[in-house]
């Protein structure tokens, strides 16, 4: 396969994930900016954080949990299931429900359980039943616009969580570190884009070795 011949890419990459990858730095930056703009109560007094999500919607939660571990004073648990752990209850629990579509069954049951147990809740989604239920209960909903697959929205699922943790005082301000990361990502694109030939593209060379 000639990896410098872009004419056949659309036949293989039918959902245009190449464009999603190219847009990841901009997506992450947009998510951070949205996270600064969305409404958020001046909450405090949390003792634990639970982030619920399934599949692609949970990828950002895993990244946030790994990033937060050295600096967040609270335990952060990523929950991929129906309902909630038994210990997740009361206003000392911050429940963040993440669902790309807003209609994920497991995440909706987690929301309902959190409401019944008196947790404080932040919903992250593009809309759907999750947004409607959280708003009806009086909790903040942070929406974003992404028409693709959940696994291609990792910039949103991570960036919004990062902004929420920062604004709630659960993490030191990551703004400078994020800016450095975005710059590094964009610099890497200069050697990894599909239009960069194999001789100057380490990603294509690795792909060639795997084929």
Task: Describe the residue ranges of each PLM region.
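Glycine-rich phosphate-binding loops that contact phosphosugars or nucleotide phosphates
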Residues: 44-190
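Helix-loop module immediately N-terminal to the HCX5R catalytic loop
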Residues: 26-39, 76-86
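Active-site phosphate/pyrophosphate-binding segments
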Residues: 13-20, 35-38, 44-47, 166-211
């Amino acid at each position: 396969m000639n990896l410098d011949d872009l004419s056949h890419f659309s036949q293989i990459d039918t959902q245009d994930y190449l464009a999603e990858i190219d847009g990841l730095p901009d997506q992450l930056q947009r998510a951070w900016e949205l996270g600064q703009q969305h409404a958020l109560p001046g909450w405090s007094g949390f003792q634990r954080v639970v982030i619920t999500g399934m599949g692609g919607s949970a990828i950002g939660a895993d990244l946030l949990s790994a990033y937060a571990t050295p600096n967040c004073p609270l335990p952060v648990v990523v929950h991929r299931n129906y309902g909630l752990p038994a210990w997740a209850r009361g206003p000392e629990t911050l429940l963040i429900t993440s669902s790309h579509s807003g209609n994920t069954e497991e995440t909706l049951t987690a929301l309902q359980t959190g409401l019944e147990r008196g947790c404080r809740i932040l919903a992250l989604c593009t809309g759907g039943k999750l947004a409607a239920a959280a708003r009806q209960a009086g909790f903040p909903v942070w929406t974003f616009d992404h028409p693709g697959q959940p696994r291609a929205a990792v910039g949103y699922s991570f960036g919004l969580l990062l902004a929420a943790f920062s604004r709630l005082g659960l993490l030191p301000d990551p703004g400078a570190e994020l800016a450095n990361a975005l710059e590094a990502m964009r610099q890497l694109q200069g050697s990894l884009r599909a239009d960069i030939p194999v001789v100057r593209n380490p990603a294509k060379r690795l792909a060639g070795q795997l084929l």
